[in-house]
């Protein structure tokens, strides 16, 4: 029987780097780990709620977190940073920072947030998954959506892309899995620079699961 493994964890330390950089004592490790997840969720919710692009999706590629004793550094890699920087004449980042600090409920730590623009946003699976989710919510046919997403990725010169959507596609009674591929995606090659994401989306027919693998050059 096939064994499934997360493609990012499979390549950690080879072609993928950690997205959280810190050290904690054993008694504090789980607390800090939960805080990291809360920070990422808070940032994603803020961007989706307040700062939306003309296409109506946030465009966050990834969030990196570094910790020191009294300082948390957060770097947001985003496809459309101008929307966050322009919001409220440059106050968008400050509002986000205050929201995260309130969520952490801590007055003795500092928080620094930096924004970095992703040069080619549609090379990132998280951004493509948001695009696909938006189209599925609008009831665009899933095959048309997958082909358009592959076309967007190929325009930005990815070596290969594979998309899988699972659930009650087009409202059919029986759930199924459909996928499409462009180029080559060697999933079993550890040294292949493959980026991956899983993104659930709620539709009127239920929850659909979107998986995207992208082979970078």
From Swiss-Prot:
Listed GO MF terms: rRNA binding; structural constituent of ribosome
Positions of the KH type-2 domain: 47-119
InterPro entries referenced in this protein's UniProt entry, alphabetically: KH_dom-like_a/b, KH_dom_type_2, KH_sf_prok-type, Ribosomal_S3_C_sf, Ribosomal_uS3_bac-typ, Ribosomal_uS3_C, Ribosomal_uS3_CS
Family to which this protein belongs: Belongs to the universal ribosomal protein uS3 family.
GO annotation (BP), single: translation
UniProt-recorded name of the protein: Small ribosomal subunit protein uS3c
Subunit structure: Part of the 30S ribosomal subunit.
Main location: plastid
CDD domains: KH-II_30S_S3
Encoding gene, per UniProt annotation: rps3
Subcellular location per the Swiss-Prot or TrEMBL entry: Plastid, Chloroplast
Cellular-component GO terms for this entry: chloroplast; cytosolic small ribosomal subunit
Keywords, in A-Z order: Chloroplast, Plastid, Ribonucleoprotein, Ribosomal protein, RNA-binding, rRNA-binding
Top-level division of the source organism's lineage: Eukaryota
